[in-house]
From Swiss-Prot:
Transmembrane segments: none
Binding site for L-aspartate: E175, R221, H448, R489
UniProt superkingdom: Bacteria
Family: Belongs to the class-II aminoacyl-tRNA synthetase family. Type 1 subfamily.
Subunit details: Homodimer.
Catalytic activity: tRNA(Asp) + L-aspartate + ATP = L-aspartyl-tRNA(Asp) + AMP + diphosphate
GO biological process: aspartyl-tRNA aminoacylation
Region feature (Aspartate): 199-202
Predominant localisation class: cytoplasm
Name of the protein in question: Aspartate--tRNA ligase
Annotated keywords: Aminoacyl-tRNA synthetase, ATP-binding, Cytoplasm, Ligase, Nucleotide-binding, Protein biosynthesis
Length: 590
């Protein structure tokens, strides 16, 4: 096999008159008798090959080529005739007149075409993932991911960070999701856990004096899957010592700025906008707001305390909220049926319903209009609602109102075409609550993780009013997605123990699970903090994809299985015996 001169997709006018050797896959063959055209594909794109009757043996061999045959060709690059130029191809101004052809491998009939825009099922594409990855859009998505990691390495290496690996086999600790457990053959009955994050280890590296750490960390969480989640994922993981929260955020911005410059050729302005958690919830109904469009939530609670609309007044006077969004020019676009569908949809957030009115000729119309007649002028003024606008109301508890209106503003903004899809809007959400109440557990849990440092002024609230305490934490948001986040960490043993107790973790439990971390705090643990950026999600957004599976070479499906290798799978009884394990037989359900 000859050495390749260049990639097929890079052959342009600068190669005219040169002899090149190319390797790749046959995308398409077109035969015109004594002339055969072949599109040769590799990761950089396509180039047109020409086989003519100057070499009858090669022409005959070219006639046997089929889609996805792997070939090697050598030939002269020439400019195409003006009429033959293809403006849709990067290499559309040139072609290669082939003088040598070698078939390196053949291909059977394919389960689907190797091209973009196919309608093949996701399961089939995952079963033949190696073929799916040949499609140009998938190649570009994976390449985009590689470019992001290269840019991140570049920034971190140039700014004094040390690339240090942490263990993938560690002990099981509660971090929110279920652990993936690995049985130990050497210690029967004992298990390792795959890390949900390198959190404790990277903090211990700070105690060891490696004040600027990073790695492309592999993380594992046994949780229910959504479109932007996988059981195994990668994060750009960073930890530093002796930095303020603002200085740490500057490092995260530096990584993102480098990535945007190198990968997207966009210079994003820094520092990024900062918004407190409470403001984000009040204005956008979300702790990860998409700020590319307005449709901000407006509070009508005080006004509605005196409303004759009993649903609103009762809600407002019971300590709950009445809030609304105005959809500009939405009155004519949305029918009652369409709005009823959205009313039904937000019930999944706990909402009892959604009221709506339309502004027509300066007056309110619609089902709720008659109940708001007395306050019509005041309401129109407060909302700055104009003719043709649609107003949506939700009255309920804080979280229900936020979740419902947060969803509605995104839904209607996208449906109305109000979102600039070409924009990358970065935002820091800061000043988070330290705890959040988990209805399922019936207790307070850490909003981020139990190592997050409280605001200095809130430490004493750990024992008295934990729900009032705020954290020195920060999330980085991109276009309504949580791209990553971090915090300053607790570095004093007494505060860490108080944090554990506030979470309902007994001294016996936290000593058993985190004794090594607490012990380290007795030996001069420095102030420290850090962050992690989700590489998969970052790549998904920069590649313009809707699912992180598209930027992972070999992902799991929505059932956490992998159709290509049929993982997970049963193992041989001898392997179970060696590990001292016994699998209970499946019981058929009635």
């Amino acid at each position: 096999m000859k050495t390749r001169t260049t990639y097929s997709g890079l052959v342009d006018e600068t190669f005219v008159g040169q002899t090149v050797t190319l390797h790749g896959w046959v995308q398409k063959r077109r035969s015109l008798g004594n002339l055969i055209f072949v599109d040769l594909r590799d990761r950089e794109g396509l180039v047109q090959l020409v086989f003519n009757q100057d070499n009858a043996d090669i022409l005959a061999l070219a006639n046997t080529l089929r889609n996805e045959y792997v070939i090697e060709v050598t030939g002269m690059v020439q400019a195409r005739d003006e009429a033959a130029i293809n403006p849709d191809m990067k290499t559309g101004k040139v072609e290669v007149i082939v003088s040598e052809l070698t078939i390196l491998n053949e291909a059977k009939n394919l389960p689907f075409e190797i091209k973009d825009g196919i309608t093949t099922s996701e399961e089939t594409k995952l079963k033949y993932r190696y073929l799916d990855l040949r499609r140009p859009e998938m190649q570009q998505a994976i390449i985009r991911r590689s470019q992001i990691t290269q840019a991140a390495h570049k920034y971190l290496d140039n700014n004094g960070f040390l690339n240090i690996e942490t263990p993938d086999l560690t002990r099981s600790t509660p971090e929110g999701a279920r652990d993936y457990l690995v049985p130990s053959r050497v210690y029967p009955g004992s298990f390792y856990a795959l890390p949900q994050s390198p959190q404790v280890f990277k903090q211990l590296l700070m105690d060891a004096g490696f004040d600027r750490y990073y790695q492309m960390a592999r993380c594992f969480r046994d949780e229910d899957l959504r479109g932007d989640r996988q059981p195994e994922f990668t994060q750009i993981d960073v930890e530093t010592s002796f930095m303020s929260a603002e200085e740490i955020q500057e490092q995260a911005e530096g990584i993102i700025k480098q990535v945007m410059q190198d990968v997207m050729h966009i210079d994003v302005p820094t520092p990024f906008k900062r918004m407190k958690w409470q403001e984000a919830m009040d204005r956008y109904g979300s702790d990860k707001p998409d700020i590319r469009f307005d449709l901000e939530i407006q509070d009508l609670t005080e006004m509605m305390k005196t409303s004759s609309f009993k649903v609103f007044s009762d809600t407002a006077n019971s300590g709950n909220l009445v809030r609304a969004i105005v959809v500009p020019e939405g009155a004519a676009k949305y029918s009652r049926k369409m709005l009823d569908e959205q009313t039904e949809y937000i019930k999944r957030y706990g909402a009892r319903g959604m009221a709506w009115v339309k502004v027509v000729d300066g007056e309110l119309t619609g089902p709720a209009a008659k109940f708001l007649k007395e306050q019509e002028a005041e309401l129109l003024s407060a909302l700055s609602a104009k003719d043709g606008d649609l107003v949506l109301f939700v009255a309920d508890k804080f979280q229900v109102v936020c979740d419902s209106l947060g969803y509605l503003r995104k839904h209607f903004a996208h449906d109305m075409g109000l979102v600039d899809e070409s924009q990358f809007a970065y935002l820091w959400v800061v000043d988070w609550p330290l705890f959040e109440y988990d209805e399922g557990f019936g207790r307070w849990i850490a909003a981020h993780h139990p190592f997050t440092r409280p605001n200095d002024s809130d430490v004493d609230l750990l024992e008295t009013d934990p729900h009032k305490a705020h954290a020195q934490s920060y999330d980085i948001i991109l276009n309504g997605y949580e791209l990553g986040g971090g915090s300053l960490r607790i570095y004093q043993r007494d505060i860490q123990e108080r944090m554990f107790k506030a979470l309902g973790i007994s001294p016996e439990t936290y000593e058993e699970q985190f004794g090594h971390l607490l012990s380290a705090m007795d030996y001069g643990f420095p102030p420290h903090g850090g962050f992690a950026i989700g590489l998969d999600r970052f790549a998904m957004l920069l590649a313009g994809r809707d699912n992180i599976r598209d930027v992972i070479a070999f992902p799991k499906n929505s059932h956490a299985s992998e159709p290509m290798t049929n993982a997970p799978s049963r193992v041989a009884p001898a392997q179970l015996d060696e590990l001292g394990l016994e699998v209970e037989p499946e019981v058929e359900k009635d």
